[in-house]
Amino acid sequence: MSKLKVVQLLPELNIGGVERGTKDFSEALVQRGHQSIVISNGGLFEQEIINAGGIHLKLPIHKKNPFSLLQAKELVKVYKEYEPDIVHVRSRMPAWINYYAFKKLDKKPILVSTFHGLYSTPMYSKVMAKVDHTIAISKTVRDYIKNTYSVEDKNITIIPRGCDPLLFNKIKPDINWLNKWYEEFPQTKNKTILTLPTRISQWKGVDSFIDLIANINNDAFHALVVGPASKKKEKYLNDLQSKIKDKGLGSLITFTGSRNDISNIYKISDIVYNLSIKPEPFGRTTIEAIASGSKVMGWNHGGTKEILEELYPDGLVELNDIAQLKQQTLIISKENYAKPKENTFLSSKLIDSTIQLYQDLLKASL
């Protein structure tokens, strides 16, 4: 296998799935003997990329305004200096800057994009389809790309996201963690734990989750909403808490806020939910929960549907059908009820498939 020079472009390197994936992929490239160059405005993962042997070049390609396009000149300099084989764009603003940089290059690298979402502004997003090849993270995203941008099947490869079994596995939480958890959340002890891991947002299904708990209304169960609320969402969070109070559910639902021990929370959860009312492009929390040994449930659409169809069909429920969600929850939550199949969505598969795609595209270009 020939050695590659790969450039990845994204706005910043702070906390997020795309950012962490870029960092992990950079590390994997270096481990396999390739050269990895990441271009962004920097952030928390910047030093980790460098420590793992990658190169990070800081450019202000993160701001969504026309002046950012002036950074195309800087990208041209980088490409002429490093002569990459592959440029991989992971976000729209950097992709536009790259688009104008490529216009100034005589010898162009292979250009790949990953659609990490179902973008809501097609005119702004079309640059992600103006590439040699596109990666879709699910069939749902592939269909969106085909229908919105008229990209041919042969120019799209589905490479699902994956999780790292070192982080998400079935090793039981240690006693120290459990003691600290039950000290902080004594209301969860000896309960059937139902968990919704999500940031607080109107489309993420927290309302539906509260409705589910109201319908079950049994203190043998305790519900956790695990995730942050941004300042913009504080009013919505207050509305949710008022709804809980009005329904008399205060003792049955806990908002934990942002946590860095989500893998252990999955492990103590009897069921983990994805109830997003818009189709998820993939459904990362669903595979993380399955990998951690939890049962999972979700609405029958988007990337969540694709994962559950493969690994746990019993967890699928028709969109917004709270009665069915309750009925299936009561069945699945029983201790002896079957758990999902082994998780097949692994980060190692994502890495191997992406590198193989690069090699295939380079071979086809000769």
Feature annotation, model-predicted:
Residues V7, Q187-K204, I210-I213:
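Conserved donor-binding/catalytic core segment of Leloir-type glycosyltransferases
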Residues V38, K295-G298:
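Short hydrophobic beta-strand element within catalytic cores of glycosyltransferases
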Residues I39-L44, P197, H222-N238:
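Glycosyltransferase donor-sugar binding loop
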Residues Y79, S258-R259, I265-S269, R284:
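Short alpha-helical donor nucleotide-sugar binding micro-motif in glycosyltransferases
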Residues V89-A95, F115:
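Short His-centered aromatic/hydrophobic patch
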Residues K103-K139:
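A conserved, positively charged/aromatic
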Residues K232-L237, G250-R259, I265, L316:
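Active-site donor-binding acidic/aromatic loop of nucleotide-activated sugar
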Residues E310-I322, L330-K334:
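Conserved acidic donor-binding segment of nucleotide-sugar-dependent glycosyltransferases
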